Amino acid sequence: YKNTDKASLYANDDGVHQFAVAPSGSADSAINWTTAMIIDNAGIVRKTYQPAFSANAVETNNVPINTWQTVNLTEIFDNNADFNPSTDAFTAPVGGKYQLNGSIRVDNLQEASGYMYIRINTSNRGYYSIVSPPAFDSTPQYWSLVINHLADMDAGDTATLSFYIAGGTVGADIHSESIF
C-alpha cells in the first residue's frame, strides 16, 4: 500500500485480465479484493460496478393536472446501488457524463389538455420533451413521451423522471410500462 484506499491488483490467467481494488489494511491482515474490471480473450470488457440501473413505473391513475408529478418507480436492476426506489432517484457515484433515458406511457389523456411534458430533472438542470394533445383530431387512448439526454453530473447529484399535464378536467394515467 502506498496510501490509504490505494491497493490494486492485476492478474492474468489464460489471457483473461483481471483488475481488482481494495481498501488498505494493516500488515498481515487479509485483503478483501473487489474485481473492478475483467477483459477476456475476445476483448469483452466487464465493469461489474459501472453505474447502470433500470426501473419501471408504478401505475398511477388520475395524475393531477397543472403540477409536476415525480414518477413512482420500481427497480428492475441496479448494478452499483445508485438508484433509490424510496426517492425514485439515481445518484451519480462520481462526476462524469451519464446517459439518462425515460419513457412515459400516458393512458386516458384528454384532447382538451393543453400540453404534456416529460422531464429528467438533475441537480444541475432539467431536460424536457413536450407534446400538445389539442393537435390530435381525436382523443388518443395512449401516448408515449420519450426523453434521452447525456447529462453532466457531479458526484452526489441526483436525477428523477417527472411528468406534467396542463389543462383538461381530469389527469391522465401513467402506465406501468413506463421506464427510467
What are the roles of these predicted feature ranges?
Residues 18, 117-121, 160:
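Beta-strand signatures of extracellular beta-sandwich domains
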Residues 19, 39-41, 46-47:
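Extracellular beta-strand solenoids
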Residues 111-125:
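Short, surface-exposed beta-strand/strand-loop-strand elements in extracellular ectodomains
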Residues 44-112, 131-136, 169-180:
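Terminal (often C-terminal
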Residues 1-27, 51, 113-115:
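Self-maturation zones of extracellular/virion spikes and adhesins
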Residues 139-158:
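Short, surface-exposed tryptophan/glycine-enriched loops
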Residues 162-169:
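Short beta-strand-plus-loop segments that form exposed binding edges in beta-rich domains
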Residues 32, 123-132:
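Surface-exposed loop/edge segments in extracytoplasmic proteins
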